[in-house]
């Protein structure tokens, strides 16, 4: 009388999981179930990247990457320049006494303003 194939399969799977449990955190079976770090980095990209990796790109590469975005102005891409050196002033309106955020949407149904 032969041994059922289902029983052999169950024994093999059980032996596999027992060997994984015995390996513990040695990393021998990371290809099956990769270990995950519980915390991870929850800060900004600059805080999560190691300091030596953060500044690997030269300034020309950084300017080219920033130039592909539509919301970066040509003035912001100038080398060694500060957009507005006045403390607390908006980058868009650097005049003394100017509003920091002068943008205002008009009254429409989506803004739910009352007239």
Curated annotation (Swiss-Prot):
Residues 1-23 form the signal peptide. The record marks 63-64 as: Required for proteolytic cleavage. The keyword Signal applies. InterPro entries: RALF (IPR008801). The keyword ATP-binding does not apply. Pfam families: RALF (PF05498). One of its GO terms (molecular function) is receptor ligand activity. It is found in: Secreted. Residues 24-66 form a propeptide. GO terms for cellular component: extracellular region. Disulfide bonds join 84-94, 107-113. GO terms for biological process: calcium-mediated signaling; regulation of signaling receptor activity. Proteolytically cleaved, probably by S1P, a subtilisin-like serine protease (subtilase). Keywords: Disulfide bond, Hormone, Secreted, Signal. Cell signaling peptide that may regulate plant stress, growth, and development. Mediates a rapid alkalinization of extracellular space by mediating a transient increase in the cytoplasmic Ca(2+) concentration leading to a calcium-dependent signaling events through a cell surface receptor and a concomitant activation of some intracellular mitogen-activated protein kinases. Prevents root growth and seedling development in heterologous system. Belongs to the plant rapid alkalinization factor (RALF) family. This is Rapid alkalinization factor. The gene is RALF.
